[in-house]
């Protein structure tokens, strides 16, 4: 059997890359979801297979600190042993060549489900013997972030924090990169909400000009992940 994404010399074939797409936002059809869909289209265009999972539809918790993943009697030290609604998705993570996870920014942070997923998928691979990874494979990770903040605010207040925030994905032994979408359109009609601080006309004009560019950037991200050796 060939390894993921590598040539099967016995058959002379190349196995199809698997890319798992995870929506960490509560809306299934808004900015984050649209960018993830574009990334998936880019991956498929490069010959990869994709699957999309909405994390908000799963019933799971953050790490329970059971430390089963650190127990020497356990056969697979890099797997989370706590079984709940995330278990099946984690198995798909372990089998993927890359994952693309998207999240809006709430109060300067990704959503709670994204944080919980990140810990559950990476903490088991962290060895407390030498602080190296016990995971035997390599999974590249792309993070797509959407936010009301503009790029200047992000660069000043969020950028370095987000780069540090997603460091745990390095325990999956692949590359981690972040794609950002700024000043997003929250709702189609701002007059229905207590959002007077936002200029609806300005928001819509920015969205009409910028969001197609963001979708293209997401498409190229997916294509690049699927093409990476």
Give residue spans per PLM region:
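N-terminal beta1-alpha1-beta2 submodule of the flavodoxin-like/Rossmannoid cofactor-binding fold
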Residues: 3-130, 195-229
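Beta-strand-loop-alpha "switch" segments that mediate conformational coupling across diverse proteins
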Residues: 177-188
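Short, catalytically relevant binding-site loops at active-site mouths
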Residues: 106-108, 149-150, 185
